[in-house]
Amino acid sequence: MIIQQNIGQSFQSPIVRILLGAIAIALLYVLWREVRKIPAKLFTLMATAFVDMLGLLMIIPLLPFYVQTLGGSGFDVLGLHFGIGMIISFIVAAFTAAQLLSAPLWGRFSDRVGRRPTLLIALGASALAYLIFGFAHSLLVLFLSRIVQGAGGGTVGVIQAYVADSTDPKDRARALGWLSATTNLGVALGPVLGSFALKLGERDLMPGLATVRMGGAAPGIMAAGLCLLNMIFVARYLKESRDFTEQPQTGEVRRTSTQATWRVISHAREPASRLIWIYAIAIGAFQGSFAVLALFLNARFQVTKETIGYFFMYLGAISVFTRVLLLGRMVDWFGEANLSRLGIVLLAAGVLGMPLSGNLGMLALAVALIPLGTAFTFPCVTALLSRVIAARDRGLYMGMQQTYGGVSRIIAPLFFGWAFDHIGVSAPYYFSSAFLLATLSLGFGLDQYARPGRLIAPEAAGLKVKASEAATEEGET
């Protein structure tokens, strides 16, 4: 209880608030100087990703309330009662499943027709999904809207492929860090805009003439409007990044998304497969342990819903500025492979340090290592993946990375939740650090692909297959 009081009292002190304000202004100034260095093409993409994430996060925090309004206390099917919690879980799972299944397909589609038209189609699907969400009058329609949204939202790999197309290999980790900082900003502002939309929905839009209110449809309508504006922005300003001059060599055919997805499992020692596994295991270990974070902080440090916001504000601030200000310089000094290893170690140390912290100062130090670790790990792993695959297959493999990472994000919280309940409140963080450190064994030998100008032979990464091999595989299936 003392820690909780210290947190609350510290932020109510005028001196602390003035100091935090001064630091914020200084950091914003430095941030603006860095933003001005971003190439115009990437700045356009970052604006697109920011608005897309802004619309998505307008809806997600409100979803449970819409389900509660439409579902009441739940319903019975074949003698089984499905409560509100279970219904929300199914709707969230439907979105995730649609996103995971669509990610490699969107990636391969973008390899064939281009990144720009793929993003335009996906944004159109998202706009439709938001409108369905806004005007949903039943759980079935709400469920349908989340499937459409998930299918249209599997384009993270396409955006990452655009970055890889548009940057030199040595600058990709820096650019991916900028991109993730932008989406983090959308995550922070989206819920606020969603709450504003709800209040706007209660107002009469035509006072004195007729009563026109958007009501509960306001967040969906505003999110759809953002998507349409984003489509216009992309159509007008975003240039195609895909180079269609590269062609497969004679006697070789390109793998389908199904073949490539299975190859990550069947040829797990290949560089591309190892990088995808590193990403999937690490992001599952990190985000899975954070699924029970609020419960852990409450049990160990008496942090409540009134004070946990300070925790995430601290975490988010370090994350954004690390990705924008530090990541590029650290890549120049260490290289992607070494920096990703350092990131894994820092992330594992931060996660492990939380249950070992005995006071507020130690907790603050441990937590500070986590955004450093994520900033150094995930952009560097993705940048390395872009090096070991052929340009014409980037969309496919970036999409597969998101698919495997998504599966990990589904499975890991279930395991860590079980560990929290049945082993102990600190158990998820011990397991998480162990899984993170285990990924270091998958990174041996990847340094060669981080050297300037060094690209792996495509056939060594398993990206191309001879026609005879493809025919054999088709015959076996």
Regions found by a protein language model. Give the residues of each.
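Helix-to-loop junctions at the C-terminal end of transmembrane segments
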Residues: 102-113, 322-336, 420-421
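Intracellular juxtamembrane helix-capping segments at the cytosolic ends
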Residues: 155-167, 376-389
